[in-house]
Regions:
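S-adenosyl-L-methionine-dependent methyltransferase catalytic core, i.e., the SAM/SAH-binding region
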Residues: 1-362
């Protein structure tokens, strides 16, 4: 876990740091006996703090994150007297710097069996507001900073490498398939022209400029008139949104991570244990839905979408997973994903695209 000196008490969580779908997550574990609880994507500990407050019976907690700073903040928040308000935190608190794909290994590190040990597991596939709000990490098109986007700062591939070294065709495919960007061809061309003219693209601000999105305002900020002069709200989506999403997914191999993390998390569940997964875009939600269906014995593998064919997801899967139906290992508790109530969306716009799916181990 993250080592280091004492941490300043974290500021009270504002809307940006508010855990999404918190009520729905608590509902997923309500009335369950959680002896062992694991949060695969700990972030600042918002979800876990609330779960632990409602479940004083938790004996062993395992919180996993790649980001050492997030771990340090979460450790402070979840300690006795910390911001989460836990009077008596679980006896065994484990903070692990690691990858959520390796949950069984992290459980073994906490002295538990790697499989069949966890009564509750939570996975939030969104990226932490700590990363988005730090311009140095290069995740946000709203704050100028180095073009980076690596969840794991130690890896070689960054957004800067992708934007400057990938060919126009490859960039276009990434924007189309991972960003679901309609104007992929035009935007890939702009990136390549801009870097040829400037020598390279080094910052998030330069990338926004390359995309022709510098100084963009939604229509409602332009005296409330839409493109035809009519009074209607304009598109709320910044034109760089999908490009930044695509690069983030590509740089971090996010779809492949989710693809291998879900079966590992299901393995880690004890009988009757529950796994809740929050996703933020349709590609991820689709992967979660089909992984759960396969584990519930309801479906053969999903037909490969363009995105999955392109990203190499499931390309390596052979044998029973693509052949027949797996024997049922879980029961799906969410026929449709749970989404944020209008009040939450108003308070925290990030929650608008969040979806929660839950399964229970048989």
């Amino acid at each position: 876990g993250g080592q280091g000196g004492p941490v300043a008490a974290p500021a009270p969580p504002d809307a940006r740091h508010a855990p999404v779908l918190l009520r729905e997550c608590l509902g997923a574990f309500a009335g369950r006996e959680l002896g062992v609880f694991a949060d695969c994507t700990l972030g600042l500990g918002g979800h876990s703090g609330a779960v632990l407050a409602e479940h004083p019976e938790v004996r062993t907690f395992v919180g996993v994150d790649k980001d050492p700073r997030a771990l340090e903040i979460a450790r402070g928040r979840l300690s006795a007297g910390g911001a989460a308000g836990l009077r008596a935190p679980p006896a065994a608190m484990n903070f692990v710097r690691g990858d959520f794909r390796e949950l069984p290994e992290h459980l073994r590190g906490a002295g538990l069996p790697g499989e069949g040990a966890a009564d509750g597991i939570l996975m939030d596939l969104g990226f932490s507001s700590l990363q988005v709000d730090d311009p140095e990490r290069g995740f946000s098109f709203l704050r100028d900073g180095p073009l980076d986007m690596r969840m794991d700062p130690a890896q070689a591939l960054s957004a800067r490498v992708a934007v400057n070294e990938w060919g126009e065709e490859e960039l276009g495919r990434v924007l189309r398939d991972l960003g679901e960007e309609r104007h992929w061809r035009r935007l890939a061309g702009r990136i390549v022209q801009f870097r040829a003219a400037r020598g390279s693209i080094e910052t998030t601000g330069e990338l926004v400029e390359a995309l022709g999105a510098k100084g963009w305002k939604p229509y409602h900020a332009r005296r409330g008139r839409g493109p035809g002069g009519g009074r209607r709200a304009g598109p709320a989506l910044h034109p760089a949104t999908r490009t930044f999403q695509a690069l983030r997914i590509a740089v971090n191999g996010e779809l492949q991570s989710v693809e291998s993390a879900l079966p590992a998390a299901i393995d880690a569940l004890a009988p009757g244990g529950r796994l809740g997964v929050i996703s933020f875009h349709s590609l991820e939600d689709r992967l979660v839905k089909w992984a759960f269906r396969r584990a519930a014995g309801q479906a053969r593998a999903a037909p490969l979408s363009k995105q999955e064919k392109f990203s190499g997801v499931r390309a390596s899967v052979t044998g029973p997973e693509l052949g027949g139906t797996d024997a049922a290992r879980v029961r799906i508790l969410t026929k449709r994903p749970l989404t944020a109530a209008p009040e939450e969306v108003e308070e925290n716009p990030r929650s608008r695209s969040a979806k929660l799916r839950v399964v229970e181990k048989l």
